[in-house]
Amino acid sequence: MSTPSSLQVLVKRVLDFQHVSEDDYCILKCCGLWWHGGPIMLSTNEDNQMMIKSASFKDGLEINLALMMAVQENNCSLIELFTEWGADINSGLVTVNTEYTRNLCRNLGAKETLNKREILDVFLKLKNFKSSNNIILSHELLSNNPLFLSEDNDYFRRIINCNLRRISINFILDEISFNEKLTRFWYSQAVLYNLTEAIQYFYQKYEHLNEWRLICALSFNNVFDLHEIYNKEKVGMDINQMIEITCAYMCSYSTIYYCFVMGADINRAMIISVTKSYTYNLFFCIDLGATAFEECLEIAKQQNNNELVKILSLKNYYSPDSSLISLKITDPEKINILLDEENYESKNELIYEESNINNSDDIF
């Protein structure tokens, strides 16, 4: 058996994210460096955000969220440790539930209460942290929290409502509780970042939100989750409605293609693309064989969109991309590789650009 390490050496090893011998586990537990079934590890993610990892939180918690959980659990040693490692002790006021722990937070520098701006700052630190553990725990700690449900917190409510309006088509915001709005928000974040563990958590816990998951997948161009739910569930939404939803978002090539392969009317997708003035989606629809030029031209004229009028007026130059249409791929990974936004070039967009160059040459 190895010689027991000092606390200082163990902390350094944990901080450096090196392997910790199982022989040292009993020391880690005694020293308060053990949480939810494993050693605590401090690390940073690809966005250089500090995070805490443990056996139950393998993909990481944003450090302030870890502090909030430690405060809820009244785990005094971890509250002190996370604060020493850089967590904002004021975040702990979100979940404090005993006077003893509140006094500890005060002694570590916490304010008496958080104002509306500070509550919003807590949320903003958490919402873009891309891990399943973080999304799930954020939902569990915030969605029923009185500080976040307060009607006085008007700016926070506007942010949530604004996020939901971008993807809401099947419900009226005023008709659901703010608690459900928060649940839908965190669910949408899981789909946005394709966090499969978090998606499964919401899927199993909130069966009534299955259509919301589908709408989010279409809205965020998440062909992986679209494929998953389309094949797992009896989707109550028509495939043509699905392609109309995804065309309402810019550069949704993968989900447009998936819906097309599953039988959606590409002309309807073309019309929505023109209505939304999404040029790239329009060219992609033409690549997939869309031919609704006359109807789309009329819409473009009504909108006084001269660029789209010019594009649609060159209909005789365009033709379907047979190599794209013939593939009929439904594998999400292959679709994403084929239609990667940075690498994919529309055949018909290139034709349009060449015609512009030729016309410019004619002028000179």
UniProtKB/Swiss-Prot annotation:
GO biological process: taxis
Signal peptide: none
Pfam annotation, one family: ASFV_360
Record's function text: Plays a role in virus cell tropism, and may be required for efficient virus replication in macrophages.
Family in the record: Belongs to the asfivirus MGF 360 family.
Name assigned to this protein: Protein MGF 360-21R
Lineage: Viruses, Varidnaviria, Bamfordvirae, Nucleocytoviricota, Pokkesviricetes
